[in-house]
Amino acid sequence: MIIVLSPAKSLDYETPAHVEAYTKPAFVDDASELIDGLRKLSPQDIAALMDISDPLARLNFQRYADWSSTFTPANAKQAVLAFNGDVYEGFDAKSLSSTDLDYAQQHVRVLSGLYGLLRPLDLLQPYRLEMGTRFANARGKDLYAFWGDRITRALNEQLETRSGAARVLVNCASTEYFKSVKPKLLAAPVITPVFEDWKGGRYKIISFHAKRARGLMARFVVENRITDPNALKAFSTEGYVFDAAASNDSTYVYRRRVGE
């Protein structure tokens, strides 16, 4: 089983990492190519391209200038400890043991506009480059063209080492990021967990809660060493319950009704 997550825009380089182990990202040469292109942009260009504030554009202009193809604990941090958004609050890697993180290293992957595909312990230098950014490059009009089938091929290398029910991809990424994966070329079926909360008289996806729940699901897989997708149906963290009637073989729906 491989579970894929989206990255986070919010980053934490202040909190010291609680583990020393780290690995190097697989697509450093590709990331370097993107950085070379990003370095040609002014802060004003970055603000317009990414629809971000001027201070944030200046911050990322400097990040691109500082970025190095040499990764060390002095200039980078393990990805799963550096990302700090809703998904990663749910995953809460800071409280996972080194043994848990070793398991995550084999079963969790993070999709990234700059780095392509990251393992949890891959070193990450600070950046901002969302997968949906229409950043024209030598390979095409946007990052989907840039990455092509590279991410899918990398996932297949991992999936092909699994067998039976364990050869499955669990999609806990956003639509924007999962578009970088080509399901028809994958060497495994895809299961997408969907998290809905009761609000206004019906069940609906509430972005903040759904993002957190994706992280909780990834943690559930890691802590319980899950390899069989049927075991995902037992997920019940923070009140979510698997709804068999709303689910099918490729979409697992979890619902929560609180306070009504």
Curated annotation (Swiss-Prot):
GO biological process: response to hydroperoxide
Pfam family, one: H2O2_YaaD
Gene Ontology cellular component terms for the protein in this record: cytosol
Protein origin, superkingdom: Bacteria
InterPro entries found in the cross-reference section: YaaA
Family that this chain belongs to: Belongs to the UPF0246 family.
Name of the protein: UPF0246 protein Bcenmc03_2247
